[in-house]
Amino acid sequence: MVCPNSNPVVEKVCELYEQISRLENLSPSKDVNVLFTDLVHTCMPPNPIDVSKLCQKIQEIRSHLIKLCGQAEGLLESHFSKILSSYENPLQHLHIFPYFDNYIKLSLLEYNILTKNTTNIPKKIAFIGSGPLPLTSLVLATKHLKTTCFHNYDIDVDANFMASALVAADPDMSSRMTFHTADVMDVTCALKDYDVVFLAALVGMDKEDKVKVVDHLAKYMSPGATLMLRSAHGARAFLYPVLDPRDLRGFEVLSVYHPTDEVINSVIIARKLPVPSVPLLDGLGAYVLPSKCACAEIHAFNPLNKMNLVEEFALEE
């Protein structure tokens, strides 16, 4: 495995990594914004690079860089979620988020892929890893899926509190948006209720963790339900984890789309396969058995009445 140090993109990414890793904090600031904007622009152009073939040193840099990107993205979303919540109707001001247009394009892309591969409008969607500014759910709910209920899952209670505040003033959105504080690995029975599950790009910060999440979803999602995943391709894999479609055990991969514009994430859509009546051997020699559902209690924010409930995720013009 040869490390292509002569590759100018890899060299530029490593240079930016050194500068980013020296920052005292990753909260929005001029220096943070300039460095991450430069990083995105460096990784955005289509590039045949296969990050899995890079040397160990670059692999370690990539792994750490993805974590730094995730931290910076979370801080940026929290910053703008707080600003938006100061408006009387936050949903009318989502455009102030600097990457809002990217979410408009990504949501349209995902909606088109979803409608091409499914026959019915989903009644209930789960978004795993929704964060303090759940733009995908908000854009899909307001522009494309206007009768669908969205259940947003995040492990961070503060993120859910901020997100729920954004829809509290809107009667329609607050009635269709629910926010659950939970680790997805603890969510079992509830997953059977969703027609579509979205998995955010930064849920599972490396391939191993992401595959564990996918395997968990395969255990508990209903047969025939749809899984939408975000991955990365080429140099964009320095920004987000990569998920190989071959790692989607228990799912039939329907389509994989790699954007070449400013939409960074690749999109994978898959369908949950039926559970075999006779246990089958998986690739590791272990039996794949139908799972027994042990319901857990998960606290959800209901922004309509602000009470806590107990409940068990080619672009067309």
Swiss-Prot record:
Record keywords: S-adenosyl-L-methionine, Transferase
UniProt-listed SUPFAM superfamilies: S-adenosyl-L-methionine-dependent methyltransferases
Mutagenesis or variant effect for residue 238 to S: In chloronerva; has no activity
Tissue: Leaves and roots.
GO molecular-function terms, A-Z: nicotianamine synthase activity
Reaction catalysis annotation: 3 S-adenosyl-L-methionine = nicotianamine + 3 S-methyl-5'-thioadenosine + 3 H(+)
GO BP terms: nicotianamine biosynthetic process
Induction of its expression: Expression independent of the iron status.
Keyword Transferase: yes
Pfam family, one: NAS
UniProt EC number: 2.5.1.43
Similarity comment: Belongs to the nicotianamine synthase (NAS)-like family.
PANTHER family, A to Z: NICOTIANAMINE SYNTHASE 3 (PTHR32266:SF12)
Function (record text): Synthesizes nicotianamine, a polyamine that serves as a sensor for the physiological iron status within the plant, and/or might be involved in the transport of iron.
Assembly mode: Homomultimer.
Entry protein name: Nicotianamine synthase
Species this protein is from: Solanum lycopersicum
UniProt gene name: CHLN
